[in-house]
A protein has these predicted regions:
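N-terminal capping segments
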Residues: 1-44, 82-91
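Feature targets compositionally biased, intrinsically disordered low-complexity regions
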Residues: 17, 21, 45-48, 56, ...
Length: 189
């Protein structure tokens, strides 16, 4: 039976939150975690060029089956979360806004720390914006999320008068994902 390297990879990488590993590249965190666990690295399994899609072990065919301690390779990944808030007052006046947040990873490597199997992952990553950022935990999705809508009544300040009035507030959250995420199960050299 093959050795399970995942627990050692996860424990080591988790201990690096708030720190920079190696030269500070995203690759360094995964590579060092695998080496510390005694597993093979991308240098053992496949292309290692600056823009290569690294191979970190055995490919996991479905991300729902990825485990904590697996290595995640990104290619042209983008996650957009749009939160649309619409406020309707008794007189029919409507005010709304729709701010959005994006996570973009064109070519990136991370260590999976949680996978509840519902399209969400939590990863440990560094150099996530290309500025040698220290290791942190990030929640991402590997598939679009179902639209979530909540409706409440509450006091809201009107934009036109500046006065607070009771209003119906509808919040719609949409998450869309594009690009490729590939998980790899650590294995021996």
């Amino acid at each position: 039976m093959a050795k399970n390297f995942n627990p050692a990879v996860l424990i080591w990488a988790s201990g690096k939150v708030g720190q920079s590993v190696g030269a500070g590249e995203c690759w360094d965190l995964a590579n060092s975690a695998l080496l510390k666990a005694g597993a093979g690295t991308s240098s053992d399994f496949g292309p290692t060029g600056v823009d290569s899609d690294y191979i970190w072990g055995d490919e996991v065919s479905d991300l729902k089956d990825a485990l904590p301690g697996d290595i995640l390779q990104y290619r042209d990944f983008s996650q957009t979360t749009t939160t649309t808030t619409t406020v309707v007052f008794k007189d029919g006046l409507e005010q709304s806004n729709a701010p959005w947040a994006e996570i973009n990873r064109s070519h990136h490597t991370a260590v999976i720390s949680k996978n509840p199997g519902n399209g969400a992952l939590t990863v440990l990553e560094q150099n996530y914006e290309g500025n040698k950022e220290k290791t942190k935990s990030t929640a991402i999705r590997w598939k679009d999320a179902a639209t979530k809508t909540t409706v409440t009544k509450k006091m809201v300040k009107r934009d036109d008068t500046g006065k607070s009035e009771m209003a119906t507030v509808t919040v719609v959250v949409e998450v869309s994902v594009s690009g490729t995420l590939t998980a790899f199960r650590p294995k021996a050299k």
